[in-house]
């Protein structure tokens, strides 16, 4: 694969702890991951970029020359989780089911989970 692997994006180390990649669409496309920002569980995303293009090799976002993640606000994270569930249900092999379940358990309020 000719792009920066999302599991190698660990900056900023003082704030971010990666738990797992939920969805990786590959080169020149997006990835979604689950982790903790300042100890709080969150869903994040980034554009992977391409190592074949020096201008885009680190993807986006980048902070201080290091590839990073964008933390999704709760309302966007919930909609993203629903879409990832649909993709998994339709057989999309790029969805990491185990990490998706960890993410749902950590981010879905109990009242929402009982109404699903």
Label each region the model flagged.
Residues 28-63:
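A short, structured beta-strand/loop element
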Residues 49-116:
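Mixed-charge, Lys/Arg-enriched low-complexity segments
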Residues 12-13, 20, 31, 44, ...:
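Generic intrinsically disordered, low-complexity segments enriched for polar/acidic and small residues
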């Amino acid at each position: 694969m000719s792009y920066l692997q999302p599991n190698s994006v660990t900056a900023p180390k003082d704030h971010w702890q990666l738990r797992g990649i939920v969805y990786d669409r590959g080169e020149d496309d997006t990835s979604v991951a689950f982790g903790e920002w300042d100890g709080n569980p969150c869903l994040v995303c980034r554009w992977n970029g391409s190592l074949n293009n020096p201008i885009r090799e680190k993807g986006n976002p980048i902070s201080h020359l290091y590839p990073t993640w964008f933390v999704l606000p709760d309302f966007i994270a919930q909609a993203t989780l629903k879409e990832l569930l649909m993709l998994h249900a339709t057989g999309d092999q790029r969805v990491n089911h185990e990490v998706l379940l960890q993410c749902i358990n950590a981010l879905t309020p109990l009242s929402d989970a009982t109404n699903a």
